[in-house]
Amino acid sequence: MAGKGVGSRLSTLFLLVLLVITIGMMQVQVAEGRMCKTPSGKFKGYCVNNTNCKNVCRTEGFPTGSCDFHVAGRKCYCYKPCP
């Protein structure tokens, strides 16, 4: 019976260490992967289709874009990695 307790403790300790490492890696990715948002200068009209917004943003030199809620409805915003 004593063997089960030690094995269980080691398993728990291993999972705890793995969880701490995973959380640490996630925080680094969030900090490095922060995206800056800018309203599209070329997109016209109400933004319904993310694909259209993304394509317009690419013509403006941004890697991606999406329709996001704005005070007046949905608007096309372009995204790029923050400096």
From Swiss-Prot:
PROSITE patterns per the UniProt record, alphabetical: GAMMA_THIONIN (PS00940)
Top-level taxon: Eukaryota
Signal peptide bounds: 1-33
InterPro entries found in the cross-reference section: Defensin_plant, Scorpion_toxin-like, Scorpion_toxin-like_sf
Residue intervals passing through the bilayer: none
Family (UniProt): Belongs to the DEFL family.
Known role: Plant defense peptide. Has antifungal activity against B.cinera, F.oxysporum, F.solani and H.annosum with IC(50) values of 0.4 ug/ml, 2.9 ug/ml, 0.9 ug/ml and 1.4 ug/ml, respectively. Has modest antifungal activity against C.albicans and T.reesei. Causes thickening of F.oxysporum hyphae and an increase in their branching. Lacks antibacterial activity against the Gram-negative bacteria E.coli and E.carotovora.
UniProt protein name: Defensin-1
